[in-house]
Amino acid sequence: IKSSAASDVYKRQVLLDKEYKPDYNIGFPAKRITTQLEWEDMVLDYQVATELEEINVWISSGKTVMEDWGLSRILKAGYRSLFYGPPGTGKTLAATLLGKKNEIDVYRIDLSMIVSKYIGETEKNLAKVFDLAENRNWILFFDEADALFGKRTSTNTSNDRHANQEVAYLLQRIEDFPGMVILATNLRSNIDEAFSRRFQSVS
């Protein structure tokens, strides 16, 4: 069994190792997703194709825009996109192919292991993902994101306040994340308006 000090050293090494590809486990509730298909295999309407090309441009040129052009002083790093549509319309495939086209790993967050009924646990579970991902060039894909990013409730009970605290925490972590975050939902109207205002693209 690792000592506490040894465990802390191991955690620091993992956090700093940019080539580290974690396996799906209780300590990292996300799974790397891949596909044998290619970008050209997707069938897209003009608007969606345009939105995805804009994302491609950001992935390939975002670092140059933010750092070389000095825009990091006035713009937050990172890119946030909402994919919506009925099941089977290609939301997961689009996210996976964005990663494949740009040689970036895509991790699908397992919300069943993230969301907890115990106060503070959902935030801790999210922190595990964001802490590991923030120094790596990953795409984080939240499928069926309504479970975490749905409309907030009025604060009539302690449970309501707890739920809204989770939303506030999520907003902060997503805004501070320097990489790509994709939220997927079956219905666009299910996503809280506070999140919707923070998306650079909606497809």
Predicted regions and their residues:
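Conserved ASCE P-loop NTPase core motifs with emphasis on AAA+ ATPases
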Residues: 12-42, 46, 53-56, 146
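Hydrophobic transmembrane signal anchors and adjacent membrane-proximal interface regions, especially
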Residues: 9, 14, 106-108
